[in-house]
Amino acid sequence: MPDFSMSNLAVAFSITLAAGLFTVLGSGLVMFSKTPNPRVLSFGLAFAGGAMVYVSLTEIFSKSSEAFAEIYDKDHAFAAATMAFLAGMGGIALIDRLVPNPHETLDAQDPSFQESKRRHIARVGMMAAFAITAHNFPEGLATFFATLENPAVGMPLALAIAIHNIPEGISIAAPVYFATRSRKKTVWACLLSGLAEPLGAALGYLVLQPFLSPAVFGSVFGVIAGVMVFLALDELLPAAKRYSDGHETVYGLTMGMAVIAVSLVLFHF
């Protein structure tokens, strides 16, 4: 496999960091503005989900199969990529089972939210931050390796994850801000959770770098594809549907796929 220059590593890490920092944007929406338009939020989440599914199944999975093809024949390479894909789905499903991700975004304008005791809400915020941080590690690893191998693949994936991180930031910020009334603490809580993505990227690269080979890259990309598809189906699309009863989810899903498809075609020219 090719040796990556410091500039390539810096670009991949910077993009991963930027995607993670979108979590902080969620805190701004809680502290400085009213609740976002549910229909717009539904469209945005579905857009990110469609983009994530499309790029995972068409580009990242293909990268896995291509890497395995350097050491196996075509059929066995596809089988190995499929096994890695299923392993990624199974692994993130296990993490989701052990550390459930809070899918319901807390709304600071909700009367029932206002009536809750601050100490209890503070615990909710800590649990949300912990759960989302645990889920951010594999997302950071996915963004980093996808961008490192091919920025044309990594950039759309990073955009999808960045959009996905905004409501996660809201999930952390709403209870923390209600409990503490401190903008500083709210921003820090979201920032620390978002930094889990570049941290996951750095740790993953340091662990895998001495062993980089076609088999390792094939496994990593297959696992990444499985993780991203699971996150889209388990988190983004259900959340999008919950925020709107109309067709925004379907429109967002198809638009996300279409935009990523066209962008990938343009990148290939």
Swiss-Prot record:
Summary of the function given for this chain in its UniProt record: Mediates zinc uptake. May also transport other divalent cations.
Decide whether keyword 4Fe-4S is in the record.
no
Main localization, broad class: membrane
Task: Name the species this protein comes from.
Answer: Neisseria meningitidis serogroup C / serotype 2a (strain ATCC 700532 / DSM 15464 / FAM18)
Which family does the entry's similarity section mention?
Answer: Belongs to the ZIP transporter (TC 2.A.5) family. ZupT subfamily.
Q: What is this protein called?
A: Zinc transporter ZupT
Looking at the UniProt record for this protein, which Gene Ontology cellular component terms does it annotate, in alphabetical order?
Answer: plasma membrane
Q: Which InterPro entries match?
A: ZIP, Zn_transptr_ZupT
Q: Which domain of life is it from?
A: Bacteria
